[in-house]
Amino acid sequence: MKSGYYISAFVCCNELQNILDIKLRHDQTIALWYFDGDKNVKLVRYWELERISGYKQHPKAFFDTKAFFELLQTLLHQENLSLDDINDIWGTKEIEKSTEYRDFFANTNIAFHSIAHMMSCMYYGNSQPFGTDMILLSLDAGPDSQFEEDAYNKNFYAGGVIKNGELDIFSIESPARLWSYSFKKFKLREGTLMALATAVDTQIDFDISKFDNISFFDDSTRIKARKIVDEIADFVFSSELPENADKRFSEEEHKISAVMKNIVNLSQRIVERNVDNIIKRYNLVPNKTILAMAGGFALNCPTNSYLLQKYRFKDYQIPP
């Protein structure tokens, strides 16, 4: 890489997506970076497109690349820069100039979207991550095929360990699909489901240990998650509520809460076994090790609290 400015753009540029309002990427962003030619990279500006467009989570595609570059030129002008000052653009197939940034990770057989999540938590609030032991977990629902066409043929979730100044990358499991399918099934966002799980005391226990032999590494997770959530929900919804159930909540809300309590426990079980395996494999000491997590599921409060209380890691790097 030569010194100068670079753009990473997590956007969509497609006429059909724009006209039909097809949403393939949410929370679209553009980042401006500066590389000094040595070892230092600086984030100059970070533009969340929802703050420009007013669209919450901005999933709207640009009509075409011309529309994108018109906006980019306007944004760069604010920094006294132009398109001619940009060495390279990454992150969106229709506009990126090269894919060299992915070459380092090509042999991992892990979707790059997950690798990107992992690297973001690795450097979150820590410009020198190689100075201490660290566990990295990219806990997301799925990859991004918008710029990596074979993403769905790879392992979905990236894990990593930094030890003795070296980074080792490997595939891990993520329970995020359990939550994304629950969102679709119950028509409630993941945060609402988390809150509802603890809002009432209603508990209808399901033997989640029966799922211990099911793995959650790749595209097969989509079908597995649906079957698991449906099975738990069928059991719970066919059960009677306790007589002292809180009358402020409907029967449906009580039963969704009971379903999600089981999903919370299963999610913790999945992440826990991955963390235990990593600690054992790399002979790590939790109170001397940083836990770094990113991806949509890394915002799962019940699981995060469980991990923090159980392992007492040295520190935590979890981007909001």
Residue locations for each model-derived region?
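Short acidic/glycine-rich loops and adjacent helix/strand connectors
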Residues: 1-320
